[in-house]
Amino acid sequence: MEQASATTTVDVLIVGGGIGGLTLAGICKKLGITYKVLERSAEITPVGAGISLAPNCLRILEQLGHLDFIRRKGQPLRKIQIFRNSTPWSLVDYDWVQEKFGYSVYSIERHSMHQVLYQGAGPEHVLLDAEVVDIEDVPTAPSVQVRLADGRQLAGQLVVGADGIRSATRRILAATQGLEGANTIRFTGRTHMTGYTHPLQHLGPADLGVATWVFYDDSILTSWPCIDNRQWFVGVKSSELKNPTRSSWKNATQAIINDVYGDRFHPFGEHHRVRDVVNLAERVTASDVFEETTFPAMACGRVALVGDSAHSMTSFIGQGACQAIEDAGELANALHAYFASQSPSPQMLRERLEEYRHRREARARYVFSFSSLFAQLHTGRLWSPMGPLLRWVAFVCAPMWCWHRALTPLYGYQPVVHALVDAPHAN
């Protein structure tokens, strides 16, 4: 990794080397905008299990040249089989998504997708072990100053916070505006236990692309199809908050997950048990799930936010990464308009970021509300005590046009980076 000097100056400083930050970095690279990604971790290691990439983010990833990789290493969703305990409820067709929106919904290993974005951004532009502790945006100054925990100083024409649900950028930004310097997230009362498996050798071609939702009496478990009949499973159960300062558990194991789900029914288990799937996991994780309570301004002065740093939401509709990618694309349009100007100025930059803010905030609120509503429906808590009945009506009785109508605003919105529309789609 490149080491920053005390006077490092670039166009854009991106705080956070996750999906959103690296996507923005890759776009900046193609647009000729200089950038530096500041990642607090000391190394890039496998984290998480799977990731969902839906049509609303795939046009941007195609512009970056990543669609061929996604098609090779990801699995398009074809069907969803739904069970109540071990009783079949319905089989939902999902092939229509490709036909209607031009892209399927893909499940792919998170780490492999992260590595592709990392290489696309350029490791030489990523500073590891770079924890941001202060951001100074003085309106009359020519640049925004960033200070790291080890004392290094960096400067950029703007700073982008892409540092996740417990965003340091957001806390610093709030404090500079005289607001409480804390993220406004709340615990949802749910713990997610997830894993990504080796191929399930007993499954066949007919099982490829088939997702599974199982509604148990006291919890739920979904599994998403990945390449070669691998499974990305997500168990959801009610729980007490273990640590208010972090989301991920430090020591998640297969045994912990099997204690909760092991003896439960799963149609893809070799013996129709969840443990048959969990025991084939390459890695597992567990996390307490938080979501946003108050939406911050997605830009203030010369500082902007993308992804979970601005609008963390539940993962039930698989839109966390998709929304971060949408943000990155829309922000890149604002940045290109600024840097391509004949007479750029700090005031013009603030105006471009304000336009970005207004474009993205309404969309983020819509997707957040959709995700929250779907989570309540999925867990049988929507309009409680009517929740279980409403869930049955939605997933057993509702005709396909209901799915089309619900998902069209979500998947039909497909932003692009305007300056890359005619560019060849290659890394």
UniProtKB/Swiss-Prot annotation:
The molecular function terms of the Gene Ontology recorded here are:
FAD binding; monooxygenase activity
Q: Name one Pfam family in it.
A: FAD_binding_3
InterPro entries with a match to the protein in the record: FAD-bd (IPR002938), FAD-dep_Monooxygenase_BioMet (IPR050493), FAD/NAD-bd_sf (IPR036188)
Cofactors per UniProt? FAD
- Where along this sequence does the record place binding of FAD? 39, 110, 308, 321
First-tier enzyme category under EC: oxidoreductase
- Kindly state which keywords UniProt assigns to this record, in alphabetical order: FAD, Flavoprotein, Monooxygenase, Oxidoreductase
**EC number of this enzyme:** 1.-.-.-
Provide the family line: Belongs to the paxM FAD-dependent monooxygenase family.
Function, as annotated, reads: The subsequent chain release by Dieckmann condensation (DKC) could be catalyzed by the TE domain present at the C-terminus of pyvA and/or the alpha/beta hydrolase pyvD, installing the tetramic acid moiety.
Protein name in UniProt? FAD-dependent monooxygenase pyvC
What organism is the protein native to? Aspergillus violaceofuscus (strain CBS 115571)
